[in-house]
Amino acid sequence: MLSLQFITHQTENYSYLESARMALEGGCKWIQLRMKEASPEEVEAVALQLKPLCKAKEAILILDDHVELAKKLEVDGVHLGKKDMPIGEARQMLGEAFIIGGTANTFEDVKLHHAAGADYLGIGPFRFTTTKINLSPVLGLEGYTSILAQMNEADIRIPVVAIGGIVAEDIPAIMETGVNGIALSGAILQAPDPVEETKRILNI
């Protein structure tokens, strides 16, 4: 079964919580609560409702960016973008029990995050995506192949999740580059039935 991370997104049709609930219903076991423009209070309110839903489905829940909140709410971990708290600092604050992921766009990013103690890397974007402002250079299949080859050469063993504008049809070719999983948002939420689409994608 595909290793799938669902990144929450608010649309005209669905709230952040509803988007996560549908992914869980479809069998996704890893939810990243991402509410970029929201206040910590708003994130906390949604996280408190989402945590028991994830627990009931035995799914991992990580927060995008909010390290202090992740510690307070005792979720599974955090994902840190390039402008968020440094991974080393987050590790000091959270200890070893929490999962810490980092965003990477280059092999240099990979080396830094690996040295700082990241548990996994979200590498991307695969292609242009509207869910992210200030997008880093697009990688495409060649970018993943190149970064993963450099990781192998440097003996850097850390799980890699491909992210950024990915649709279901891209998944087989992306997985062939050697990544460990895929992160999706719009590909699921834009489907006529997000629950069924999640199930379908997990079986690709």
Swiss-Prot record:
InterPro entries documented for this protein: Aldolase_TIM, ThiamineP_synth_sf, ThiamineP_synth_TenI, TMP_synthase
EC number per UniProt: 2.5.1.3
Gene Ontology terms for molecular function: magnesium ion binding; thiamine-phosphate diphosphorylase activity
Cofactor, how bound (note): Binds 1 Mg(2+) ion per subunit.
Keyword Manganese: no
GO BP terms: thiamine biosynthetic process; thiamine diphosphate biosynthetic process
Protein's UniProt keywords contain Cell cycle: no
Domain of life: Bacteria
Residue sites binding 4-amino-2-methyl-5-(diphosphooxymethyl)pyrimidine per the record: Q32, L33, R34, M35, K36, D64, T103, K132
Keyword annotations: Magnesium, Metal-binding, Thiamine biosynthesis, Transferase
Pfam families according to UniProt: TMP-TENI
Cofactor(s) in the UniProt record: Mg(2+)
GO cellular component, as recorded: cytoplasm
Family annotation (CDD domains): TMP_TenI (cd00564)
Biological pathway: Cofactor biosynthesis; thiamine diphosphate biosynthesis; thiamine phosphate from 4-amino-2-methyl-5-diphosphomethylpyrimidine and 4-methyl-5-(2-phosphoethyl)-thiazole: step 1/1
Family of the protein in this entry: Belongs to the thiamine-phosphate synthase family.
HAMAP family xref list: TMP_synthase (MF_00097)
Protein name, per record: Thiamine-phosphate synthase
